[in-house]
Regions:
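Short, basic/aromatic recognition patches
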Residues: 2-28
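Short, charged beta-turn/beta-strand-edge "cap" motif at the junction between a beta-strand
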Residues: 80-82
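A generic secondary-structure signal marking the coil-to-beta-strand transition
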Residues: 17, 25, 52, 84, ...
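Structural motif corresponding to alpha-helix initiation and N-cap regions
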Residues: 14, 61-62
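Charged, gly/pro-rich active-site loop segments
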Residues: 1-12, 85-155
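Short beta-strand segments
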Residues: 24-60, 68, 74-78, 87-91
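Short, intrinsically disordered, mixed-charge
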Residues: 69-74, 109, 113
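Amphipathic alpha-helical interface surfaces
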Residues: 17, 64-67, 100-104
């Protein structure tokens, strides 16, 4: 029996994966759940190159927040325009006190340049503060899986 040669492709460099994570792209957050499939939802995010953390704001008392608290870990996947991807995985923590302008309003403005600030302030804030239970979630990237389709085609 002959062995099949498998071409698993090439991964992104650290610089390219951080560049992709810093772009304004919708990513998919996946959280393992007991006796169920994973909860996978799209999220707006912000990549912090200094800390190596993926950051996003969301409710703590909603299905996503409850799943994050129960699992304590999550993964996040982002596609590039050429069928490549970057996936990170790691422990999840949250902060109730955070820089609202940067993390909540700033992220909204990244994704909706013309209306993001108004959208976030009218949907997630009251009198300049986030609604109770809107927290900053952080995933500390411990493991990576990436695929660079351009590099794989060239090799």
């Amino acid at each position: 029996m002959s062995k099949l040669k498998r071409n698993m492709g090439l991964g992104y460099t650290k610089e390219r994966r951080e560049e992709l994570l810093s772009e304004t792209r919708l990513g998919i957050l996946s959280i393992a759940r007991e006796k169920k499939g994973p909860l996978s939802v799209p999220v707006w995010h912000r990549w912090d190159t200094e800390t190596g953390e993926l950051r996003f704001t969301s409710g703590i008392n909603i299905r996503k927040g409850e799943a994050l608290l129960a699992a304590g870990r999550a993964s996040f996947t982002l596609l590039d325009d050429d069928s490549g991807y970057v996936m990170l995985e790691g422990p999840v923590t949250y902060d109730e006190e955070y820089d609202f302008e940067l993390e909540l309003v700033g992220t909204g403005m990244r994704y909706l340049p013309d209306s993001g600030e108004d959208y976030v302030r009218s949907t997630y804030m009251n009198e300049g503060k986030p609604w109770p239970g809107i927290v900053l979630w952080r995933i500390k990237a411990e493991s990576w899986l990436t695929y660079d389709s351009k590099a794989s085609r060239a090799s």
